Design a protein with these regions (language model features):
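Cell-envelope/ECM-targeting effectors and their regulatory/trafficking segments
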Residues: 1-87
Length: 87
């Protein structure tokens, strides 16, 4: 699942790695179904919307700094890329 890069940008390669991690179909775009799978993976309520609760759960799961973000910000994406690279 290794991305081999850490740039903080959630582009198609990062999206595809997230999809593989959560067991979704891999097309490089995060669908509502993918987001729900991500939420289940990190222990957040699966509503299909990335908000502050999902971000806190994701940041906890991957060991990222909890920064109060309401979306997949660059710092969290960078931490997620590192986490996925280590898998």
């Amino acid at each position: 699942m290794s991305l081999q890069f850490v740039d903080g940008i959630r582009g198609p390669k990062t999206n595809a790695a997230i999809e593989r991690w959560v067991g979704g179909s891999v097309d490089g775009t995060l669908s509502r179904t993918d987001v729900k799978a991500l939420q289940r993976k990190v222990g957040a309520a699966p509503d299909g919307v990335i908000g502050p609760r999902t971000m806190r759960a994701l940041q906890t799961k991957i060991g990222a700094t909890k920064n109060g973000s309401r979306h997949l910000d660059r710092a969290t994406v960078r931490s997620l890329q590192r986490y996925l690279n280590a898998r």
